[in-house]
């Protein structure tokens, strides 16, 4: 697991040894960033962007954003076994000044209130069996976390059948092995 592009290109990231954590695979991550950079379906620039990385895990997505000149990443993670790895990856890449780690479970509406900013990109990578995606997307909308032209990127198991809020617009969906990635926004 590594940083694919940008100022930190080639830097290795620590990953957990347990099987409960499912780090974002390099091929999937590279495809996501190719879509962000080259899609004509939405217009978002990584340079100078504010990023919210929910269920951050090792921080692979957010750190890739920082490597590609994003302004700031807010990492949200509550799994106690992965938090030291997330913090080590941030420190080893000297990204502490451009990041914030929130150690919080975000499975209810009140937990979203501690997040004070608006974001250009919100990345959700919940555990594959997580059933509260609809509720999380509604909380993101109600908390006004996404900027007007921002996008939400969701990484899920491809067999998951998810419900989406009425105001959520799926822009693009791609499959990679056993996972799928959904790009969307609010209309």
Regions picked out by a protein language model, each given a short descriptive name:
Residues 1-187:
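Class I S-adenosyl-L-methionine-dependent methyltransferase catalytic core
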């Amino acid at each position: 697991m590594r940083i694919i592009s940008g100022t930190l290109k080639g830097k290795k990231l620590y990953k957990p040894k347990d099987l409960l954590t499912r780090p974002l695979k390099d091929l999937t991550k590279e495809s996501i960033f190719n879509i962000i950079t080259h899609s004509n379906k939405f217009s978002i620039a990584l340079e100078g962007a504010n990023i919210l990385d929910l269920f951050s895990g090792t921080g692979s997505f957010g750190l890739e954003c920082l490597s590609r000149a994003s302004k700031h990443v807010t990492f949200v993670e509550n799994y106690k076994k992965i938090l030291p790895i997330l913090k080590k990856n941030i420190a080893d890449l000297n990204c502490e000044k451009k990041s914030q780690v929130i150690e919080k479970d975000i499975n209810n509406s009140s937990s979203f209130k501690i997040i004070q900013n608006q974001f250009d990109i919100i990345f959700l990578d919940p555990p594959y069996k997580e059933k509260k995606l609809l509720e999380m997307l509604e909380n993101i909308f109600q908390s006004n976390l996404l900027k007007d032209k921002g996008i939400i990127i969701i990484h899920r198991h491809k067999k998951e059948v998810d419900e989406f809020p009425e105001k959520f617009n799926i822009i693009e969906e791609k499959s990679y092995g056993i996972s799928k990635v959904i790009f969307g926004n609010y209309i």
